[in-house]
């Protein structure tokens, strides 16, 4: 069916047909091809991105920033290019996401720095943490305040205490680590 077919269908079914005013004409566009679908997805992405920029979030390249409607972002957060924010992700205030980030169902506190190329799912990061570059957080991970997870570090169901550092080349799986601990390179838990 085409969107315009709705009028004839409604009349055949003896339904009431009336004109309505829409504030955003993009909401009434039909999708009849893959090209139309891509245009509509861009329209929706632009609308969501505009909402966040008006709320005080900086998007360095809105054309490559993908934010789902369910995401929440704190004021004065800066989001770099090629970032995908999905699901129930909540990002605090004054965070910096350098770019090429894929976040799904994340809870991120204030003043967190996510360096280039991070993948994160179903985890929590407390205030002031620094993550990446090239870090991977898998479900069930909780990073305390001021934790540093460096390059090529992966964590799964890891509970990492405040101030702890795993600077590079480390796997933290199914583990609880106390505060102010330094994890050496090449560590596998």
Region locations from a protein language model:
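Terminal amphipathic alpha-helical/low-complexity segments used for targeting or macromolecular assembly
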Residues: 1-64, 69-71, 76
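Structural signal for interior beta-strand "rungs" in well-ordered beta-sheet cores
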Residues: 58-189
């Amino acid at each position: 069916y085409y969107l315009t077919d709705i009028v004839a269908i409604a009349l055949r079914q003896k339904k009431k047909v009336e004109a309505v005013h829409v504030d955003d004409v993009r909401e009434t566009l039909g999708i009849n091809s893959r090209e139309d679908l891509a245009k509509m997805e861009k329209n929706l992405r632009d609308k969501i991105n505009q909402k966040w920029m008006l709320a005080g979030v900086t998007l360095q390249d809105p054309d490559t920033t993908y934010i789902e409607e369910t995401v929440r972002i704190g004021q004065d957060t800066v989001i770099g290019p090629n970032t995908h924010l999905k699901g129930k992700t909540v990002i605090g205030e004054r965070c910096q996401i350098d770019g090429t980030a894929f976040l799904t169902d994340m809870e991120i506190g204030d003043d967190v720095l996510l360096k280039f190329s991070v993948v994160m799912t179903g985890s929590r990061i407390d205030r002031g943490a620094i993550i990446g570059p090239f870090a991977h957080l898998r479900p069930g991970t909780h990073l305390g305040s001021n934790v540093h997870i460096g390059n090529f570090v992966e964590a799964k169901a890891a509970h990492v205490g405040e101030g702890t550092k795993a600077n590079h080349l480390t796997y933290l799986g199914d583990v609880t680590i106390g505060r102010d601990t330094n994890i050496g390179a090449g560590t596998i838990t």
